[in-house]
């Protein structure tokens, strides 16, 4: 019988702001953003498996296994271990329990991949350090490294050069409009600001920062614009990532709860507190 040997969270993240400060020679954009984690997460459960086989149990996703980021993470980590000459790896089964909405700007898939890499590396003897795991994660998705890094940070480059910071940890009301965001449409939109003035890890809180995708998403999706206006009646509100989620900032959970009661019931919403140490890292160091 399979035995649960490790259970780890795959937390959400917020982009407290997001600027594009130019285009790189490789076609990517240079970004500046602040990542902060939430105490709201998917869960990965790791089980022993007979015959050294590997499996993924995903109850909620219609994504084929070979396209699932958890499976891609497992495959990539096995390959890296084998390149190091470590081939006798114990089999395991990973159960993915989803809680985070998809297509939300919360980094759910990337967080799943990061937790898979960190968890499997621990189960297999911790032969890779954080920098090596981040290098694997970078090939899976631009947001994977920050979840492995595990601390709130001011991020630059393509979002993978980190300076640790300790911003306030308020309560957030996070709401997902019922829209599907095309990232390609956002990057090609004429209203997208691509040359923001740079800020720094020390002064970003004193600057007029924003999410450059927010006006574009609101222009393309009136539902987002209307929800944003409604939430602004209660608290400062901003888009996270490229959307579709909006987050409103409150000093207390009660204030966030009162605002949540006004959110239409057909929309996905939740309340969470900001975390400067990732819940994944907190769990591993308990």
UniProtKB/Swiss-Prot annotation:
Query: Can you state which reaction this protein catalyses?
Result: 4-CDP-2-C-methyl-D-erythritol + ATP = 4-CDP-2-C-methyl-D-erythritol 2-phosphate + ADP + H(+)
Q: Tell whether ATP-binding is among the UniProt keywords.
A: yes
Catalytic site:
13, 143
Provide the top EC class: transferase
Which residue windows are transmembrane per the record?
none
What does the sequence similarity comment in the record state about its family? Belongs to the GHMP kinase family. IspE subfamily.
The entry's protein name is 4-diphosphocytidyl-2-C-methyl-D-erythritol kinase
Q: What is the lineage of its organism?
A: Bacteria, Pseudomonadati, Pseudomonadota, Gammaproteobacteria, Alteromonadales
Q: Point out the gene that encodes the protein.
A: ispE
């Amino acid at each position: 019988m399979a035995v649960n040997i490790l259970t780890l969270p795959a937390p959400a993240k917020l982009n407290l702001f997001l600027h594009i400060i130019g285009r790189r020679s490789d076609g990517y954009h240079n970004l500046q953003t602040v990542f902060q984690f939430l105490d709201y997460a998917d869960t990965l459960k790791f089980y022993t498996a007979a015959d050294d086989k590997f499996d993924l149990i995903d109850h909620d996703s219609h994504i084929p296994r070979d396209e699932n980021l958890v499976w891609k993470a497992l495959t990539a980590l096995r390959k890296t271990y084998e390149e190091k000459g470590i081939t006798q790896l114990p089999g395991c089964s990973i159960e993915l329990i989803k809680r985070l909405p998809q297509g939300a700007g919360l980094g759910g898939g990337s967080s799943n991949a990061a937790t898979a890499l960190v968890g499997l590396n621990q189960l297999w003897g911790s032969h890779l350090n954080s920098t090596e795991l981040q290098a694997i994660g970078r090939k899976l998705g631009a947001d994977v490294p920050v979840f492995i890094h595990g601390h709130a940070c001011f991020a630059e480059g393509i979002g993978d050069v980190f300076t640790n910071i300790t911003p306030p940890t308020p309560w957030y009301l996070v709401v997902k409009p019922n829209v599907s965001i095309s990232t390609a449409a956002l990057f090609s939109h004429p209203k997208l600001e691509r040359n923001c003035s740079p800020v720094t890890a020390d002064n970003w809180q004193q600057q007029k920062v924003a999410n450059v995708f927010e006006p574009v998403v609101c222009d393309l999706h009136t539902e987002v614009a209307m929800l944003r206006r409604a939430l602004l009646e209660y608290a400062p509100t901003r888009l996270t990532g490229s959307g579709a989620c909006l987050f409103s900032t409150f000093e207390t959970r009660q204030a966030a709860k009162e605002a949540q009661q006004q959110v239409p019931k057909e929309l996905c919403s939740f309340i969470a507190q900001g975390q400067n140490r990732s819940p994944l890292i907190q769990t591993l160091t308990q």
